[in-house]
Amino acid sequence: MFGLRRNAVIGLNLYCGGASLGAGGGSPAGTRLAAEEAKARREGGGEAALLPGARVVARPPPVGAEDPDVTASAERRLLKSPGLLAVPPEEMAASAAAIMSPEEELDGCEPEVLSKRPAVLPLLERVSEAAKSSGADGSLPSTPPPPEEEDDELYRQSLEIISRYLREQATGSKDAKPLGEAGAAGRRALETLRRVGDGVQRNHETAFQGMLRKLDIKNEDDVKSFSRVMTHVFKDGVTNWGRIVTLISFGAFVAKHLKSINQESCIEPLAESITDVLVRTKRDWLVKQRGWDGFVEFFHVQDLEGGIRNVLLAFAGVAGVGAGLAYLIR
């Protein structure tokens, strides 16, 4: 065993240009041994000739240890050195970060900045978590609006916009009747929600279907679970228009499902549930963002860009990409 290990060190040292290691270090005996080993190499024995085979019996390595390749060249053994195979942690992290995340695979192209794409997959994960976090008695928490919200302008405007959008999505047709409480600002917000929300649904239909299966909404009692999901979504403290519009878009997706199973009476409670959570938990943020006016401004599309978008979507529609490509999360 010592002979094998010693010869490997000699070969590595010779390859690196260092002095050979004899039995006695720098002693004459060590010098003579190095000369004999060099002679054996020149005569064609290679690394195997350095082994005193008649005098030393190679013992098998311990269990789990790698059997040294005594016939390999010094260069080959050097390349197999464990130290050379070690990768710095920062390089490993960079390699892992380079792998495309599932979110990036949702969109075939991204004509606008990444900051406005609604993140759907994280919501799917939170739906899964929320579905497992029901109360010990199996009941779902309800979220009735505080009494003061019933007379709140932001609440009334939000409820009217969200309720109108969900009903339109369920029936498949626009309601031509003017908005009451929301007024002109609500009309602009509804138009923006139609454009952005429809695109989100088309672009992330598969993810929404998975979320709907997890919630298993079949009646009005099941609609209450949507409140728990939304509350859980905002649990991390992150609030932005992309996340809000994604939740409303998913609510519209649920409204279509309710229509398909003859549960249209649940659509209005669903709209109330969405409005309750948004206004109750995110009132300060909504006020700071100027409410629905801020929503319109955030997703505003310039006329020039709109013309370009129409051309791009004409081609994108052939590939089934959909109008949701442009609406990215902040």
Curated annotation (Swiss-Prot):
Region (Disordered): 129-153
Motif (BH2): 284-299
Taxonomic lineage from the root: Eukaryota, Metazoa, Chordata, Craniata, Vertebrata
Glycyl lysine isopeptide (Lys-Gly) (interchain with G-Cter in ubiquitin) crosslink residues: K116, K174, K177
Keyword line: Apoptosis, Cytoplasm, Developmental protein, Differentiation, Isopeptide bond, Membrane, Mitochondrion, Nucleus, Phosphoprotein, Transmembrane, Transmembrane helix, Ubl conjugation
Gene (name only): Mcl1
Superkingdom, taxonomy of origin: Eukaryota
Modification note: Cleaved by CASP3 during apoptosis, yielding a pro-apoptotic C-terminal fragment.
UniProt keyword Zinc-finger, yes or no: no
Protein name: Induced myeloid leukemia cell differentiation protein Mcl-1 homolog
Site (Cleavage) location in chain: D107, G108, D137, G138
Compartment list: Membrane; Cytoplasm; Mitochondrion; Nucleus, Nucleoplasm
Originating species: Rattus norvegicus (Rat)
Record note on quaternary structure: Interacts with HIF3A (via C-terminus domain). Interacts with BOK, BIK, BAX, BAK1, and TPT1. Interacts with unphosphorylated BAD. Interacts with BMF, BBC3 and PMAIP1. Interacts with BOP. Interacts with BCL2L11; may sequester BCL2L11 to prevent its pro-apoptotic activity. Interacts with GIMAP5 and HSPA8/HSC70; the interaction between HSPA8 and MCL1 is impaired in the absence of GIMAP5.
InterPro entries for this protein: Apop_reg_Mc1, Bcl-2-like_sf, Bcl-2_BH1-3, Bcl-2_fam, Bcl2-like, Bcl2_BH1_motif_CS, Bcl2_BH2_motif_CS, Bcl2_BH3_motif_CS
UniProt GO molecular function: BH domain binding; BH3 domain binding; channel activity; protein dimerization activity; protein heterodimerization activity; protein-containing complex binding
Record flagged with keyword Membrane: yes
